[in-house]
Structure formats: structure tokens, C-alpha cells
């Protein structure tokens, strides 16, 4: 019998091992063969019920995949989440693709407030890429929701691939699958050939999308990045760390020794400085709560999972403890919590940002 592959994720179809990759029940397989649409059970559930089952790509598999990309003469399109650059850097990528042209794609640009200029974001992404040892040929901002942005992206890909194949790489949760779906629609008019979802680690095996000249765009599985907030939340609460709508900044006038809780996911302490406004950029649904710095830790312990959510009461058992990162700020600076959002400090201040253990907190020149 010829080998069949899931048209959702590309995994080889098998009917033996329920826990394994590409599993589908025999009855579903027969039905799929009749309709010509063979999905593994995981993709089927994802398509029809938005139900997510977790499958892990081992680090070993991922290294194999990077080797394959690095060994090919292809354009590498590296998709990152503008909202979470740190959480979307692929460790070691520059080492593997040193010989390839890399096009850096900043995704989810529609989430940034309209007041952010594209040129500023592009410049910032290029700076950050250089810090990570990458030398992209160009930076493109895009959004899977925006047709003209996808057209621009395709034009850039055509410009830089010079008749070669294209590999699309990215960590999980950067919106890569949704972007690939938009590209497929742009090229072929076929909607939803690939699974898209919000759970870390969804696309598996590489997907092939034919281009006019006999070349292919290959979509590769997302690697799970350990420093993303997304690992610590259930599917229902993932929405707080992958906003879908334009973020509305909120400014809080704080006195020194005041604290701002970011749901139960993090906290911001204004330790020392003149009274001033701090501007927050988080998902619009995330409830922020102001309190006194004194007793803030006890307040968190008492209210996390209740007044301070997410995490909810069930998730909080597994949720890592918050760890403090102190900063002395001199001028306009963004304090970024990887995968959650950022706080703009407008003047001189001594502050602390608390984030779950293992989640990166970094500073950057204010982007707005």
C-alpha cells in the first residue's frame, strides 16, 4: 500500500498507535480515502472541533530538520512574532543557515497600536536579528489577516528566492501556520490545507506548496521554545498571550512603591523615582490591578487564580513562581516580558519586573 500523508500536518498516516504521530482510526481512513481528504485524528479534531491534542517534536528531530534546511540551496523565511521576538528566536539558527539567504518576517503587525511606524519596527527587528548573529537580506512585516500584506510578502519571497525552493521556519505560536494558509490561498485559492491553531507545537513534518516554476515552499514544524509564556497556560487562556486584536495602550500614573499586577502572569514594581505615567501594552482582556508595593507578594499568593487571573485556580498549581528582574531606567525604555507584552517607562526610575521563572524579560529602546 502506498504511504499516505495527512493533508493537515504532513505526518505519515498510521492506524496502529493511538498516541503516535499521524494516527487515524481505520474507519476514518476509509472515509477519507473516499472523499480524497485524509487527515490524522489530531488534525481532524482541530479542524472540526477546535480541539487540540499535543504532539512534541523532539529537539533531535528539529536539529535534523535544520540540517536539511542548511544543506539545501534555498531561501529561508524565518517567521517571528513582533509581539514576542525573544520567545520566537530559534536557538542556533544562524549556525545552520549561515550559507543561505534569510528573509526575516515579523508577523502579527496588526496587533501593534496604529501609532507604531512600520519603519521603526523593521529597524528594531533588524537590530535584534544582528544581536542574535543573524544577517537577514531583508525584514518584512506582515499579518495573515491582511491580504495586501501577504501580497507584499509574496513579492519579497519571489524577489529573493531567485528560482530556488523556500523553507519557512519558526518556533510554535508565532502564527506561522495561519500565515502559510494565507500564502496557499494567495497562490492556489485553496483555503485551510494546513492545520492552524494556538497550541505550541502544532504543525508537524514539512508541508509542500508547489510554485509555478517547479520549486516548492516547504513549511516546517514549529519548534517549542521553552521561554514562551504559552507553555504555562491551557488552550483557553492562551488568548492572553497571543492577542488577536490591536492592542490599546493604557497609562497608569504611579507613585513610587506602587505595584501593578498583570493578571496573575506578572507584576511591575515602581520602586523609586518621581511620580510618573507608565504605559502598558498587553492583551485588551488582561486585567491589570494596582496595589501597594508593601505586602504585594502576600497579596499575590492570596489572590492568584482568583482576583489575579490567568492562571486560573487549576493552572496555578503548575504555574512557575514569579521571579524579579530589577532595572534602573534613564530614559524612554520598553520593558518586555517575552510573549506577554511590555511596559513603557517614560523617565528615570528604579523598577522591577516579575515574570514566571524561565520567561525572558528584556529592555529595548521604546518602540513608540
Residue map of PLM features:
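Helix-rich effector regions associated with P-loop NTPase G domains
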Residues: 1-4, 8-75, 100-103, 109, ...
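Amphipathic helical hotspot of TIR/SEFIR-family domains
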Residues: 56, 60-63, 85-96
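Short acidic, S/G/P-rich loop/turn micro-motifs used as interaction or catalytic elements
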Residues: 82-86, 110-113
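Conserved ATPase-coupling elements of RecA-like P-loop NTPase cores
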Residues: 87-90, 114-119, 227-230
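A short alpha->loop->secondary-structure connector
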Residues: 94-101, 189
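Canonical P-loop GTPase G-domain recognition
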Residues: 103, 111-174, 185-192, 196-197
